[in-house]
Amino acid sequence: MFLVNSFLKGGGGGGGGGGGLGGGLGNVLGGLISGAGGGGGGGGGGGGGGGGGGGGTAMRILGGVISAISEAAAQYNPEPPPPRTHYSNIEANESEEVRQFRRLFAQLAGDDMEVSATELMNILNKVVTRHPDLKTDGFGIDTCRSMVAVMDSDTTGKLGFEEFKYLWNNIKRWQAIYKQFDTDRSGTICSSELPGAFEAAGFHLNEHLYNMIIRRYSDESGNMDFDNFISCLVRLDAMFRAFKSLDKDGTGQIQVNIQEWLQLTMYS
């Protein structure tokens, strides 16, 4: 067993699936995302060099990373995604907006009533084409696989209705934040705009973590486009929620074995 200290510090809380859905679904979802309310890793160690020097360097690097992330989890109070429910279990008090979303989800998800990574990629890319002010290379299949994985609470490899709704609501909110903090209207978030955007999303990180994120998700000039911004926040939200679920006594520390650690980190 080994100890993993607190992760970060913050809180957090797709476009038509191909020709069969036609432009109507894309138009409706594009409208939904436009109507969003405003506001809103790290280095492993090196090998063991002569006389133990390499091992000492490795431990210092790892210790620095853990120290950087250990200040964060205490203030994170996410609302977990609602439990999965069968599509037919529609509550009488659902709003018309939720009922409409269920109908759209049914069209998108198909007979299995789940959204795959490919279906998610199609819907997100159809929506972002309606927003030329968002600079993006498009959502790739690997990005969407990662997004599905971190939201996939029952490890089916797909998103059920509640999982997809939770993801979609976050994307709407984060899109509004992205536009708000793109102050120079470049279509990207630059390194100086990033802290404000992340704090508006509820993630209060230290400088070391911001630098790590910029190196991982931004281009060589330090600019982060929309798909990388969303991908990063989806991952942060999922990591925070996973940590909180394991930190049952609220100490800011969790203890996991190697199998639990691999399960947590590899399927994401």
UniProtKB/Swiss-Prot annotation:
The regions listed as transmembrane in this protein's record are none
- In which compartments does the protein localize? Cytoplasm; Cell membrane
- Assembly and interaction partners: Homodimer or heterodimer of a large (catalytic) and a small (regulatory) subunit. In presence of calcium, the heterodimer dissociates.
**Modified residues annotated as Phosphoserine in this record:** S6
Q: Which organism is it from?
A: Homo sapiens (Human)
Where, per the database record, does this protein carry N6-acetyllysine?
Answer: K179
Q: Which UniProt keywords apply?
A: Acetylation, Calcium, Cell membrane, Cytoplasm, Membrane, Metal-binding, Phosphoprotein, Repeat
Q: Which SUPFAM superfamilies has this protein been placed in?
A: EF-hand (SSF47473)
Residues given in the record as Ca(2+) 2 binding sites: D152, D154, T156, K158, E163
Q: What is its main location?
A: cytoplasm
What disorder does this protein's entry note?
Pulmonary hypertension, primary, 6: A form of primary pulmonary hypertension, a disease defined by plexiform lesions of proliferating endothelial cells in pulmonary arterioles. The lesions lead to elevated pulmonary arterial pression, right ventricular failure, and death. Primary pulmonary hypertension exhibits incomplete penetrance, sex bias and variable age of onset, both within and between families. PPH6 is an autosomal recessive form.
Q: What is known of its domains?
A: The contact of the 5th EF-hand domain from each monomer allows the formation of the homodimer and also appears to mediate the contact between the large catalytic subunit and small regulatory subunit for the formation of the heterodimer.
- Mind naming one GO cellular-component term on file for this protein? extracellular exosome
Enumerate the residues binding Ca(2+) 1.
A109, D112, E114, E119
Q: Recall the GO molecular function terms of this protein's record.
A: calcium ion binding; calcium-dependent cysteine-type endopeptidase activity
One biological process term from GO is: proteolysis
What name appears for this protein in its UniProt entry?
Calpain small subunit 1
